[in-house]
C-alpha cells in the first residue's frame, strides 16, 4: 500500500512515498508435539528440520524527496522471494497450514539534503575516544551535520568509514577498531542510521534523516550511507582474528549493508547474507554467550529486529522479536495508523522459547534520526569509556526495555500479536521523554489503541480502558476484602483477650482460696489447744476431732502408699462366694478381617440343566464374500420338442410302381421353449470362501528421476561449547627406565604411628616383704623319713632318632597355623636312679605374702584348687596370650605341671618377677586378640572352646599388612639373625645324685657377646645368616639354665622347618654371634641371658641343691603330662583349644606320675599307644601336686586374675618339695635302660611349643641319645596328588605370577610320630586335610605364600642331637657384617650379611615383601646327613611312606606359583657365592609335568648364554605401586657356585640415546610364566618386571 505524506520541515517540503511490503508466510505444518526443536541437541533450543514457505512481495515505488525543489534519487526496489528455510522448527507436512502476513512500511525519505544527486549523508561515527576533544558530543555532532549539509563537495571527505565501504572489499575498517578484550564496539557518536533488520529474510528500510541525534540516546548502530546499487555482505569481526572481509554475496537487495557481528565465539555470521530483499542495514550484533547466533537465521520466522541485539546464554537460537517502526511526522495520523496496523509480527516458536527472555525493542524516534537504542540488562557490565554510555546506563537498567520517543512525548507502542499456541504478554516500561530518554526494546503483547494507558503503565502496549477498569475494580474488591477480614480479625482478638483476662482472674481467685483453706486447716489443727475436760483430761470438740481424724487418715494413707506401714501378710482369707453374673458387655469392635481363606475343594458337579428355550432368531449375518466360482455344471438333459401337426393327407396318386424305399427324413426342428417357471425359494447362504493365495509380487518400478536440488539451507546457529569429554584411557605403560645406581641407605624412617596396646610391661622390682600372714593350721606331721642316698647316675642310652618336627600352633577361631618344628633327635630317657628314703616331713610353714602384685603363676594355679574339684572358670582370653618376651619362664626342674595346657586352657598363671631379656631374633610373637569373639569348635569326643575367629598367622619373616585384622593379633619383630648352632660340645659330666631328679649338665659357657641386633619400630626385619660353628664348650652345671633357654631358642631357630620358612635360598654359614636383646615393637628389650640368670637364681633360692643329680627330669613330667592329657582328650592341640579347667586338672593329676624305678616301658609308637609310654618301670606312681598343701596354695590364684605376677615362686617350690617328700614319693636309683621306644614327641617339638608358651626354660637339656626308634608314618594318607589336585580345584588359582619371598608358618600340621599325635593324625586325616586346604586358601596365607623353594642344598655333616655349647653360637663377626636397607617406591632393596650371607626384601606399594635368610645348609637342610629328618628319620621316606618336607615345600610352592598367586611381583635375586651343590633332583614332574622339556631347554639356554638373565614379566593387571625394578638379593649358593655377581649394565640416561646392551631374547608363552619365575629365582638370575605384552621375555646379556 502506498501512502503519500507531505511534511513541512526546515523550510523544505518533503514528500514521502511510503512503500508497504507485504510478507506472507505460510507455515506448512505445525511443530511436532514434545519435540525438541533444534538440530543441536546440546543447545537445548528449537529444531525440527521443518520447512517454511515464505513469499515476500515487495512493492517498490519511486519515492521522491523534494527539498529545495530538487529530486533526490530513486530508492526503489522490487523483489519477489520464495525461500525455503530447511532448519525451521516446523515440519513440512502439507496437511496443516499457518499463514501470517507482515506489513512493514519503509520510508525512503532523505531530508535536508542540499544536493540532488548525492547519496544521503550521515555524520561519520567515530569510535575513538572523545576525551581529547574539547567539545561536547552533542555540540560536535551538530556542527558536523551542519557542515556536511552545507558543503556537498566535502561531505564525504570526513566519512572515512563510508568511503572505505564504497571502495568495496579493499576496505578493512568499517567496524570500530577494538582490542580483543572488548566484546562491544565503543561508539562515541550518535548515528542517524535507521535501517531495520529482520532475522528471517524480511527487510525494512529506514528513513534517512539528517537531523541531529540527541547525545542522550546512544546508538550502538554501525552507520553507513550506501548509495543505491552497492551491496555489501556480512562483515565478520571475530575477536580472535582481527580480519575484516566485505563479502559481496548474493544479496537480493540493491543496497544492503550487514551489520558487524561481534561474536566472542568464532562462530558464523550472525545474519546470513543474501536473505534480505531491500536496502537494509543490519545492526551491530553482540553475542555475549557461546550459544548460537542471536538472530537465528536458521529458524525462518518472521520476527524482525533492529540494531543491537544482546543474546543471553540461556536462549540459544532464540528468535529475537523486534518492531519495525517508521518515523514519519507524528502530525500525520495515517502514519500512526500504519504503525499500529501494519507493524505487527508473529513469533511462531514462541511456545518453545524461554519465558523470561530479554527481547529488546529497538525504536526509531522521529527527531533522533530513527536511532535504535538497546538496553540490555547487563549493559552496565560492559566497559564503555564515554559519557554517552554512562547516560544510557542510567536509563537502561531493567530487562523490560523501554520505548523512547522524543519530540512530543507520544509513546509509540508496537504490538506483537502471537498467533502460535500461546500468546504470551510481555510488559514493557514506557517512559515518555523529551529529547533524551534512555531507550530499550522488547517485543510481545497484544495490540491496543494508542495512548490508552498512562505513561507509567508497565503494560501500556497491551491494556485497553476496560482492562484498566476491570483491574481497578478487582483491586478495590481485594482491598475491601482485606479490610473486612482485618476488622473481623480484630474483633476475634479482642474477644480472646477478654477471655484470657477472665481466666487469669478466676485462676488467681482459686489459688487464693486454696491458700486460705490450707492456712485455716493448719490453724485448726495447730492453733487451738485441746480443752481440759471435767475429768482433767484433755479433749477436743467434735469439729476438731473430725479435722484431726482427717489429717491422721491422710497421713496414714500417704505412709501406706510409700510402703512404710505395710505389715506382714495375714492369713489367706476364705474364698468368697461367687458374685452375681455381670452384665453383658458391649459388643467389641469388629476385628481385623481375617486372611483370605484357601479356596475350598471343588464341589460336586451339578445336575445337567434342562434344555433352555430356543433364543430369538438372531439378526441376519453379514453377507459373506463372493465364493470362488463353482465347477462347470454337468450338461443338462436333452430338450423335448413338441411334435408338429400332422399334415393333411395328400390326394391318392396313381399307384406307381413300388419305388425304392426312401431314406429316413430329417429330424424335425425343436419346438419353442415353454414359459419360464416361477423362481424357486432362496437357497441357504453359502459358506465363506477361503482366502485366496497372495498374488505374485509385482515388478519393481523404474527408478524415478532425481528431484531438483533443494535450496541451500541457511547456516544454523553455533552450538554451545561441548562439555569436556570423559577422561581418556590411561596410555600404555612406558618402557621401564634404566636401573639407577643403588642409592645410599636412607635415613631412619620417622617413628611409626602409635601401636596397639602393648603387652603387660615388665613386672616392677621386688617390693619389700609384707607382714607375715596369719599362721595356717598346722598340718599333720608325717613320719620323718631317713635322708635318702643320692642315686648313681644312670647309663646314657643310645642316641634317639630325630623326632617329628615341632609345631608352633596358635588358634584363633577355626584356623590354626602350624610351623613345622625342627627335627631334633630326642635323647632317650636315662634310667631313673633308685629311690632314696623319704626324709621326715617338715613342719608346715606360715603362708608367705605375695610380693608381685595381684597375679598368679601356673604352679599356684594348680595348687589352689583340688584337682578333682569341678571348676567353673574354664578359659579366659588372657590365658591364651603367649607372651614370648614379656613373661618370666615358669619354674625349672621342680615344676611338675608343665604342659597341661597342651590341649586347651592355658593354665598359665601370673608372670613371675621380671625375667631378663631373651636372646634376639625370636621370629614371632603371638598375642591373642582379646576382643576376638568366642568361637566353639567341635572336635572328636570333646567340646572345645577356642578364642578368636581369624586365623592367627605367625608372620615368620613377614609382617602382616597394617590394615589386616590380624595386625592386632600378631606382632612380629626381628632384631638380628640368630647364629647357627655351634659344633657339638663334649658330653657333660653326669651330675651327682641327690634328690633323684636327673638334670643333665648344662652347655659350656657362653662365647663372647656379639653385636646387639638392630632394633626398629617397623615389623619388617630379616634374620641374617647364621655364624660358623663355635668351639665346643666345657660341661657346666645346672646353674646355666639361662644358657639352656638360649640354646633352646637357637636350636629352634636353626631347625630345618623353621629355616625352610624363614629363609629363601640359603647362603653359607656366617660367623656366630652372641644373643642380643630382643626389641619389641613397643620398644621393650629382653635379654635372655638375664632371664636365664634370674631363673637360675630362683632355683637356687628355693632351697634346692643345684649340683645334685635327680633321676626324674622335667622331660618325664612333660611327657607324662602330654601323654596322659592326650590320652584323655583324644587328640592334641596346643594352647588354643581347651578342655574345661576341671577336666584339665583331673587329667594333670592322673598324668603326673613319677615312676622312680623299674624297667622302662617301650616308647610310644605310631597310632597305637593308649597307655602311658616311655617313662620307666611299672612302679606305682603318686600324683605330685595332689596334696592339700599345694592345692590350698594355688587355689587362691585360680580364683584370682590368672596372672603370674603375684606368685611366690619360692613358696610354691618349697610346698611342692615338701609335699613330695611327705607323700612318700621315693626317688630311687635309676633302673636299667628300657628297650628302644617308638618315636615319641620330638625334643624340638616340645621346645617349639614351649617357646611360644609360658614355660620357656623349664625343660632341662635332653638326655643321651636313645636307640633309634621305628619311624612312624602319620602322613601316609595325604599324597602329593591330593595336594596338587586340591590346589588346582580349591580356588588357589589366578594369573600366574613370579615367586615371592617365603611365607608364614603353615597351618596346624598333622600330628607327628608320637603315639597320641599319630593316633590323631590317623583318625583325623580328613579333617586335617580340610584344615590344610582352608588354611592354604585363606587370603591371609595367600598373601604370604609366594616364593618357591630352591633346589636342595649341599649335604651337610651329620649333626649331634645334644645341645651344643653356647660358646660362640651367637657370636658374629661384626666387622664383616653390613646391612643396608631402603624401602621406597620403586627403589631396590638389598643387603648382604656377614660373609656373603644374603638377606633382602623389598616392599613396594603393592605390599610385596621379600625375605631371604641364608643359613648354612640347603633349603630344607641336611641335618643328619640326608634329606629332612636324617637318613633313616621318621619322616624321610618321601610321600609314599613318609613325608619329605623339602619335596613337599617345593611342590606346594610351585603349585601355588602355577596357580598364579601373587601375580605381578618379581624380585631380582643374587646370592653370595656358595659351594657347588650336588646334582639336583629331577625335573618338577608331578606338578609341572608339562614343563619338563622346557626346563631343560631353559637351563641349557641359561648356561650357554651367560649368568645373568632378565625376565620380563607381564603382569595381567596393574600392580599398585611400582614393583618395577624392584630387586632383592636372594642367592642360591648351591647352584650359583663361586661365580661373582654379575650386575646388569644399565646406562645413565635413556634420553641421551644410550640403552641397555642389546639383548638376545627368547619369548615364552604365557602359560610358562610361573616356570620362568621359578627358574629365575632358583638360579639367582635378575628378574625384572616390564609390561611388555602377551609373553615373558627372557633376555640374556
Swiss-Prot record:
InterPro entries: Collagen, Collagen_superfamily. This is Collagen alpha-1(XVII) chain. The chain crosses the membrane at residues 469-489. Residues 568-1572 are annotated as: Triple-helical region. Residues 1573-1597 are annotated as: Nonhelical region (NC1). The keyword Mitochondrion does not apply. The gene is COL17A1. One of its GO terms (cellular component) is extracellular space.
